[in-house]
Amino acid sequence: MYSRCIALVFVGLLASSLAANCYGPAGKLAVAEFDAFPSPVAVGGTVYIRTNIQPTYDMGSATVQLSVYYSDNFDVTGLKPVVDIPGLQLCNLSTSITCPITAGTHILAWEYRVPDVLPGTYQVKYTILEDNPPDGNPYSCIQFSITVEGQKTNEFTSWYQATLLGTALFTQPDYKLRQIGEALQVGPSGPLNGSISPVPYNGSIKYLSGSGDLVPNAFYDTSNFVWGLSGTMVKQTIGALGQISHIYQGECYLGYINNINTSIAGNFYDYMTPLIDGTFTLNWTYTDSSTAEINGVAQFQPAATIPYGWGFPLLYGRLGEHQVVTSDVGFLMIKGNMPFCTSGVCAAPPAQGGSKHHGLSSQKLGLAIGLPIAGVFLIILIAAAIIYYRKRRESEKEDGVFAVSRKPEYGSALVVDGIIEETMGSKTMQAMLDMRDDDESEHDSDDGYGRSGQSGRSGRSRSRSRSRSVSRSRSGSRDARSESDPGESASRDSDSD
């Protein structure tokens, strides 16, 4: 007799641990509310499970299949396909699951298939028993319903996680799955059209674009999204907290891959978005292989640290009729905040954790705020400089002081009240020397010699007039200088007399 093993050896019975997919352009999913009751369990113990499939709508001749397609150290027996008899409202499946004999985190995924069912709503109940008698008292009952629209294959898959710490199961506070039946947000009608080019992961977020925004727990038909992958894959399984990847018999969860064949094109369709908000990265890592086996790795990385029981299945999709290959990464952004969880306790994201959960990082947000502010300060600085320069020019003009720019041979001069205070240039200097000669000759002459004195004053007056008219041409300056020569000659004649 195996030791007792609790029914919820699978602690991860949360909204993120349960997913369903109904095919069709407007597929819907409804999940009932239930509680999870973690409790200690012995390593190597056995749990007996009886699954009641009880449809609320006649399933007709549909075949119900229950299978485990991934078991991490779990010994699962008794899972066999069951044929539903038309009109029968109850189907029972009994099985036993033996817990791993080693401590650690272990994953068990099992799947129900109800192909080709008629439109309607179906209920599925998981009745988990603690001990061997199939009719023993149930420890927990988990139920959810599926709404099928159209003649499409209906599949839904549950993932369970058991973390064995020594001889006891990892325990955490009770969690209640949020009811998402009536509050289900369905994606836009019709398919999302677009193209995604896989790019190497560089830490950035790539939005899955199309007609309408993606919302949590919504169904999207992305059959027109082409990934354009090629080659073959190598089978590999990786399991870690917050990072789950697996491909088994052509099927993979967290990036669900099914019906893979030897085609070298890839269409990713029937996308089931995560049940919780946040930023999620779907990594596809493939290497070449010469074998005919279906191989590959699909890796899913949530944006936040998550405790046991969270994180899968957060992303549900299907890759049909194609073989996916290459080494690339796809990105999916769900608007909103993903709960930030540590030690099994979930709370709102920390204030500084926004960059992990949103498209804008803190660095980009700082630039988005800082650059406009810097631009405003720059504009104010330029305007102040212009105003200061204009006021200075006006003040200088009022004082009669302004700068004059001339040709190189005339240099530049500073004119104060029409009088040249400082000059540069050979020709301008020569003009200044000529004016100095005029002044000296005028002082040497006597008032009795009116001709020479008048000529000297006339020359000085013309020189001052020439100084005030700074824009006069060079030829005009030479003419003015030549006009003063008779006065100078007369002054010299007077001196000789």
Curated annotation (Swiss-Prot):
This is Serine/arginine-rich protein PSR. Changing R464K: Reduced phosphorylation by PSRPK. Its main location: membrane. The keyword Isomerase does not apply. It is a single-pass type I membrane protein. It comes from Physarum polycephalum (Slime mold). Disulfide bonds: none annotated. The chain crosses the membrane at residues 367-387. Keywords: Glycoprotein, Membrane, Phosphoprotein, Signal, Transmembrane, Transmembrane helix. Residues 476-497 have a biased composition (Basic and acidic residues). Glycans are attached at N92, N193, N202, N261, N283. It is found in: Membrane. Phosphorylated on serine residues in the RS domain by PSRPK. Residues 459-471 have a biased composition (Basic residues).
